[in-house]
Amino acid sequence: MSEVSLQAVKDYLLDLQDRICDALGAEDGAATFREDSWEREQGGGGRSRVLENGAVIEKGGVNFSHVFGEQLPPSATEARPELAGRSFQAMGVSLVIHPKNPYVPTSHANVRFFVAEKEGEAPVWWFGGGFDLTPYYGFEEDVVHWHQTAKVACQPFGKEIYPEFKTWCDDYFYLKHRNEPRGVGGLFFDDLNRFDFDTSFALMRSIGDAYVPAYQPILARRKDHEFGDRERQFQLYRRGRYVEFNLVYDRGTIFGLQSGGRTESILMSLPPLVRWDYDYHPEPNSAESELYHKFLIHREWV
């Protein structure tokens, strides 16, 4: 097995954060990311970057964190009791972009690395991550481009990787209490250690590097699309699903809160404005109803 290199992973993640912020900041053109470096009392720290009230991005957060501790929180050991009592290190980049224009989808991406150690035993390590897209008004060409970019990122590692990670994404980003997917999916993977370290790390890098070419063309294509109050109100309503998922189901949010993470950074993914309407149903045959019938369904996009 190739040797685990925490420093190589950390260097990559810091560089990825830089590249994503540069690309998205350039696409916005009006606002820049504000950096907030922080330390965690129990061990570790990170740097959070937030762009707010831009010309294109209403709120975007790109967070790097590297935290460690004496034992993993319950969210990490629930499915793997053999990890109980091990010290851990966790590092990753996580981002959510909430655009102003309702015709631009929200995007989320995350790549992360965990290692759990115990004296006298081999370290247990794994990678996780992925990216997913949440449109408000769907465009088929955008979703196909998103999934095609995801597929290309996975191809060097085996033809089974894209369909496996796509299905995993569809299953993970699903609001059980609403009986609907959060968006149109993408890739999701966790507990990845089936390859040696170098190959697993290369797969994580390939997926991390694919986020900007997957999202930036969609952002550029839709950011100047005309919209009115109707579209804005529907966007705010659908953002409610994002909030529900992140606070009820998201593993990263739960892990962060259980491990004593930095609350401002953990909740950075939430949109600045959102609304809930009681028992809302879109008008039949409207652009809003099209989202439910054409996009928030299980589909093979490529």
Curated annotation (Swiss-Prot):
Protein family membership = Belongs to the aerobic coproporphyrinogen-III oxidase family.
**Which Gene3D superfamilies is this protein grouped with?**
Coproporphyrinogen III oxidase, aerobic (3.40.1500.10)
Q: Indicate the quaternary assembly.
A: Homodimer.
| NCBIfam families given in the database record | PRK05330.1 (NF003727)
Coiled-coil ranges from the UniProt annotation: none
Positions annotated to bind substrate? S94, N110, V111, R112, G260, G261, R262
Q: Which residue ranges does the record annotate as region Important for dimerization?
A: 242-277
From which domain of life does this come? Bacteria
State the name under which the record lists this protein: Oxygen-dependent coproporphyrinogen-III oxidase
Q: Which UniProt keywords apply?
A: Cytoplasm, Heme biosynthesis, Metal-binding, Oxidoreductase, Porphyrin biosynthesis
Question: Which Gene Ontology cellular component annotation is one that this UniProt entry carries?
Answer: cytoplasm
Active site location: H108 (proton donor)
Kindly list the residues the record flags as site (Important for dimerization).
H177
Q: Which organism is it from?
A: Alcanivorax borkumensis (strain ATCC 700651 / DSM 11573 / NCIMB 13689 / SK2)
Name the InterPro entries on file. Coprogen_oxidase_aer, Coprogen_oxidase_aer_sf, Coprogen_oxidase_CS
- Catalysis performed (reactions): coproporphyrinogen III + O2 + 2 H(+) = protoporphyrinogen IX + 2 CO2 + 2 H2O
Q: What is its EC number?
A: 1.3.3.3
